[in-house]
Amino acid sequence: MVESPVISKWVRDSLEIMDIRAEQSGLPFVTHRLTPETDNTFWVNLLGRGYPFPRKKLRWCTDRLKIQPVNKFVKEQIAEHGEIILVIGTRKAESARRAKTMAYYEKKRVRELLSPSSTMANELVFSPLEDWTDDDVWIFLMQYRNPWGYSNTDLLTLYRGATADNECPLMVEKGLPSCGKSRFGCWVCTMVEKDKSMEAMIANDDEKAWMTPLLEFRNRFGDETNDRGRRSFRKMKGNLQGTYKQLHHGPYLKYWREKWLEELLEIQKDINENGPEEFANLELITIPELRCIRRIWVFDKHEFEDSLPGIYKKVTGKKFDDPEWVGSEAFRKEEWDILEEVVNEAVNDLYSGEEMLFEMVYSLIDIENQATSLNKRKGITESLENCIRKTFYKNEEDATQYYMDRVIRKKDLGGKYNSLALDGRYDYLNEENEDEDEKFYLKSSSRNQYNDFKEIDYA
């Protein structure tokens, strides 16, 4: 997955020991490590579907990677037991926003110390540490032994290593930072400009220098300056949206999805071979995720070249294991290369500037090929028409002009239109991600606050 490998290992080892100690002590404790569905992981969305890297106005990751797995597990427990009490370590001292939220639900308590859940019925929330400070937490951990025998000192060392000065002052001066200010999250997180915790861990400990490629890779794909040019000028479903003479770009292009996958596999291989022994089997991306990405590329994006197995073999030297794969027998990489050559010749000789022609042709061929049997012919005409609508533009300039003309036509006819597209004073960069893709990315979300999110066509 995408948690910091060091923290992930610490958690796995701790949970394993917890299970062992619980069984030895005859205690009814069972640990569950929650993970997202394979179809909803970070890499499947970023590299498979081409979702833009998460940012403040397009934060698709938290719901899919954290909230949905937790909600699914909680619902299963409520279905089995009727009611549950969720014990969590949230504290008011973590942030002003957290304190405000906790104070709000504190007023709604149905029983002493038990707050109602903000999203689920029959779930009560108990926060025993709600009034603890960072220092309270560390003093407790250093004074009391871990009940399942795991080292709290090792945990302190982890947090100390993640601070810029490699120190963790406890109750010395109010102005000094505590270890609790270090934040451990996903190593791929692009919600912040810099991953200061990982930078500090690498700077403070030579033995963690093996994580440097992870940090550098995160900075490369999270480069907002060059991000727009790496993405299609169309949205995820092929529609256009924009502001004054500018289109809002959508998913990542094929080249970048393949390039980043290859880089990720190379980093994984390097860590396995040259990193610490305990990370010799580290998986930055799993085989099930790779299989899911392969199916999205071939069946959803019509990239019948089927490049993933080749990328995998190039990096690892091994054949890609996918026993349930059933691909096309008629169209593969050889046919893809021939088609690309023919289309490029046509563009050079007859259709100058037709940048979308190759995508239109290979998509139409693949759509027809996927519907060869009679039971799959239903809706084939509509699918072909939709494909043509997505790719009939000559290039981005042509698509932009088409979009602007359409907005003007809607205005002239008295229809609903995107007024921002006609406002030359509007800075599209400030609102680029408040668009239909955000609704598309969140449409399948299980969070209650997104259930009533309706899609509006402004253009």
Report each predicted region and the residues it spans.
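Nucleotide-activated chemistry modules centered on ATP-dependent adenylation/adenylyltransferase
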Residues: 1-459
